[in-house]
């Protein structure tokens, strides 16, 4: 059945390519670089006074720099599922870490593969749910052909991976990001010769903790006592925040070096002029901000939810983009830029017309926490639905409006306007925009325990799917009958 549906995609793509006037004469390559836990503020071009990111700063000057990009659910697995499917966590059930992305979900590599793209994946996967060290066979790779990846490994030095059709463990040489970059460079060079468009996703594991695993030469660049903390880190967390920030920034600068090498390879092979380059992250990290312990995310504040998002596309002038974007918007936008038809399953919105026209739009980018987990106090982390606009962050909890920040005038989100009488009209307006987004995707915002029951999850003590090196019980979200059934688009159908 799946093979038949992919065949239908191929036929549809062929017809669409010949009929669509907006299809490029030569489809662009796509190089997608995704870091793990890199918050939006932690770059030189974003104004961080500590971190050294000369290569990303260079890329930013040539790119569309999205200043209001958010992770739809700021945790690893949910973001990655939304990125590859263009669908929201409440529609796929992928709102916990270590769940298995259902095989019937139509994903990025299958869509682009049907349009004759070569597809390659290097690095962290975290969508298989069979255990963090388990082999992922080709039929569970969602269309990625070239494969050097593993489910999840938080070591970052000599980490394991699998390649091809072999279940034999391999190990990256030295610091993972350096070795993964060399492999990505090799992939680019090989595909420069054959002329076939490719999509290559390089999914790095850093700067996710443990921060101490960063190379010593980079840690030496960041003495903890010299690190400047933002004003929203309370005194009780400042010492630890500086210690963690040393390794965090070291990982960032090491990865910046890798990105520079890949950009140079694109230029040397002549592919830079026809390659979409994206740099982003699956979510951010608190690092003590808002009183949330270093290493944590999932909370609604910008340090957790806002991510860097640079998109370099030949023919579109570099600029700062104020239009908000959320994870499910990324896939349809890339398809729009590449001239590939958008499948009906996708819920995100295609922003490519705005980008081509050089226009901005004050839209509401939706993000959420469906069922909280991790060791974060519930006054900081609870079920929420939120929107990011060009100016505001508005967050609603189950009991009503929770927080409202003016991000233009309150960069560090220290002044909550939600309870102010003078902000009542603004709260009402933003709540209406939030409710419109929820209605569009059929999300009736219920308690997390109800969502867990709806999707048939069995959770562990930490509130999420139990994880281990290998698992005998794989948890694949499957929606059950509820009191208020929600209709979702059919999966794996042709565009």
Model-derived features with residue positions:
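Short, charged, surface-exposed hinge/linker loops at domain edges
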Residues: 443-461
């Amino acid at each position: 059945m799946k093979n038949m549906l992919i065949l239908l995609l191929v036929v549809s793509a062929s017809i669409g390519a010949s009929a669509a006037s907006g299809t490029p004469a030569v489809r662009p390559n796509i190089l997608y670089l995704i870091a793990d836990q890199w918050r939006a503020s932690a770059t030189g071009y974003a104004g961080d006074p500590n971190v050294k990111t000369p290569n990303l700063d260079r890329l930013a000057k040539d790119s569309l720099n999205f200043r209001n990009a958010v992770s739809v659910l700021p945790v690893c697995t949910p973001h990655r599922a939304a990125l590859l499917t263009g669908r929201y966590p409440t529609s796929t059930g992928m709102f916990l870490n270590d769940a298995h992305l259902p095989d019937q979900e139509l994903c990025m590599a299958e869509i682009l593969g049907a349009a004759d793209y070569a597809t390659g994946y290097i690095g962290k996967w975290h969508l298989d749910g069979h255990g963090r060290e388990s082999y992922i066979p080709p039929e569970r790779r969602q269309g990625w052909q070239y494969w050097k990846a593993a489910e999840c490994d938080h070591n970052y030095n000599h980490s394991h991976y699998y390649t091809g059709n072999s279940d034999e463990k391999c190990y990256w040489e030295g610091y993972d990001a350096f070795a993964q970059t060399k492999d990505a460079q090799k992939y680019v060079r090989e595909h420069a010769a054959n002329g076939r468009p490719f999509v290559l996703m390089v999914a790095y594991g850093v700067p996710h903790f443990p921060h101490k695993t960063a190379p010593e030469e980079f840690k030496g660049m960041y003495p903890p006592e010299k690190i400047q903390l933002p004003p929203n880190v309370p005194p009780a967390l400042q010492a630890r925040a500086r210690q963690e920030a040393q390794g965090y920034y070291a990982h960032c600068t090491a990865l910046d070096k890798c990105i520079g090498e890949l950009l140079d390879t694109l230029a040397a092979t002549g592919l830079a002029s026809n390659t979409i380059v994206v740099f982003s992250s699956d979510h951010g990290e608190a690092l003590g901000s808002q009183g949330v312990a270093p290493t944590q995310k999932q909370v609604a504040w910008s340090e957790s939810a806002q991510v860097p998002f640079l998109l370099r596309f030949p023919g579109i002038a570099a600029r700062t983009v104020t239009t908000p974007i959320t994870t499910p918007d990324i896939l349809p936008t890339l398809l729009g830029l590449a001239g590939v038809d958008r499948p009906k399953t996708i819920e995100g919105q295609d922003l490519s017309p705005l980008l081509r026209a050089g226009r901005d739009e004050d839209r509401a980018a939706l993000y959420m926490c469906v069922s909280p987990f991790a060791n974060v106090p519930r006054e900081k982390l609870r079920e929420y639905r939120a929107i990011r606009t060009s100016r505001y962050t508005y967050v609603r909890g189950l009991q009503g409006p929770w927080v409202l920040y003016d991000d233009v005038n309150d960069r560090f989100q220290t002044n909550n306007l939600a309870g102010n009488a003078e902000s009542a009209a603004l709260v009402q307006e933003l709540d209406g925009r939030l409710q419109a987004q929820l209605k569009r995707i059929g999300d009736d915002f219920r308690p997390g325990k109800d969502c867990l029951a709806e999707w048939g999850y069995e959770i562990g003590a930490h509130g999420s799917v139990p994880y281990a090196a290998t698992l005998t019980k794989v948890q694949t979200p499957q929606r059950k009958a509820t009191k208020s059934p929600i209709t979702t688009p059919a999966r794996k159908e042709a565009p």
